[in-house]
């Protein structure tokens, strides 16, 4: 992870020792379940706050894998299946999300649940004021961000199959109670 000006880079590098997994088993799974054939290179992104994230390369194709971290976890934490389900549901809308490729809940494959999605090029801005771009580009970035937020707010969660997602009620109250 490095920052240059206001743009943050999560450039991939070697897989950290604590996050290594059976890459051959992953390649077999992806060939069988998603038709991704050929040699598979795995690198780990330097950033990420909760779930280890990896760049998968197979020929000219690139994908992102997100998996649960190792160790003891809160039962309701690190639910990569939820991430997958939400983005898969949003793919039915005009909200821009990467194409979901596969969800694997069989821990025998790489030791934990994971999902794979397409890799999309982009930039991550560390400073919300985005000082290193022109005024015009900054305005376009803010307009695009606001457009996507508006699209998210227009999503009818029932129409995209998320009516049974989560527990109704006060989410924040439950979180405060859990961590206090």
Where are these regions (language model features)?
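Short, Lys/Arg-enriched N-terminal segments with co-localized hydrophobic residues
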Residues: 1-7
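Juxta-kinase regulatory segment immediately upstream of eukaryotic protein kinase catalytic domains
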Residues: 8-40
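ATP-binding pocket architecture of kinase catalytic cores
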Residues: 39-180
């Amino acid at each position: 992870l490095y920052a240059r000006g206001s743009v943050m880079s999560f450039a991939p590098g070697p897989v950290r020792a604590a996050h290594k997994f059976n890459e051959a088993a992953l390649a077999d799974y992806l060939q069988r379940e998603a038709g991704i054939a050929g040699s598979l290179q795995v690198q780990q992104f330097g950033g990420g706050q909760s779930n280890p994230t990896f760049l998968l390369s197979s020929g000219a194709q690139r994908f992102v894998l997100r998996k649960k971290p190792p160790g003891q976890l809160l039962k309701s934490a690190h639910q990569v299946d939820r991430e997958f389900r939400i983005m898969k549901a949003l793919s039915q809308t005009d909200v821009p999300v990467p194409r979901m490729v596969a969800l694997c809940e069989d821990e025998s494959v790489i030791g934990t649940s994971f999902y794979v999605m397409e890799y999309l090029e982009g930039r991550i801005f560390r400073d919300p004021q985005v000082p290193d771009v022109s005024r015009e580009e900054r305005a376009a970035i803010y307009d695009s961000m606001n457009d996507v937020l508006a699209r998210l707010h227009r999503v009818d969660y029932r129409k995209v199959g998320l009516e049974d997602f989560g527990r109704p009620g006060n989410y924040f109250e439950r979180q405060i109670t859990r961590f206090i």
